Amino acid sequence: TIICAVSALCIVTTLNGFEYKRPSSLNKIMFSGEVMPIKHLNAWRVQYPDAMFVNLYGPTEITCNCTYYIIDREFGLDEKLPMGKPFANERVFRLDDEDKLVDAGRPGELGEICVSGTAVTMGYLRNPEKTAAAFVQNPLNDRYLETIYRTGDLVYYSEDGELFFSSR
């Protein structure tokens, strides 16, 4: 199993690293940190056709990853990888500019991805202003204290309900 930043995996394919040395026993390849270019994903899948490939998403502030997508089909160069679904201990949702929920029933509409759950950190060390801006009470919950992390990342749902990263 290998878990790597996307940039590290891309360096291997860009510099023809498979021609130099190729590990023979990789069965799971998971990547995170940025959007994986399909060209590089396809190169890795050629080298390891029997391996499980998993696209991970999540910022450091929620202990690294909050969604996963198991890649179970070929992707064309013009396609994007979905972000997948949340881990069991996380809730991932989108808010619009007015802090209203943007659900999957509104495909194509951008919203800021927010995360709640057991992996959300307590904030930024010695930076209360930044913490107060990003770690806030869930505006959808007025019944009890529920801190969420506002990632600042914009995402959208496709027509078939898949979640996609748009921009930071």
Predicted segments, located by residue:
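AMP-dependent adenylate-forming
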Residues: 46, 52-55, 70-168
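Adenylate-forming
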Residues: 1-82, 87-102, 129
